[in-house]
């Protein structure tokens, strides 16, 4: 391919990447040309990602997850999306994926479930990525205005505290004082 190499990060994103029949071939071209290749997906078709994860276990895959079942379904317009994504992520873990996680877009409608999703990722042994204070047309808003910033700040503070506690627990096992 004529595409140059040396990219730090390449993210294959949407629309929805798993709608492409040639997603594995796209990964075949991009994987050797970047330090990190990521697929950002809604996570509803994990079986299409299994061959990619088996071929490239270090590929970074993030499923969009906006909270518990009802919240995720409301924001994403999905039916049973939460369970499908959790079960799908387990399939990718079983397939040998090493850089897996959920992506959470913080907004007024779901900020109260941020710690829940973080705890879920800890239990599953996967990552959590967040995009904060964001809304847009795909979240049924056009003003891109976050209304309850104080509530979001408190939720982020709680998440950071939880993460620091987790780090402290981990460090105590690695380097006991």
Located regions from the model:
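Conserved Radical SAM active-site core
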Residues: 1-58
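Radical SAM enzyme [4Fe-4S]-AdoMet core and its adjacent flexible, acidic
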Residues: 1, 28-29, 33, 55, ...
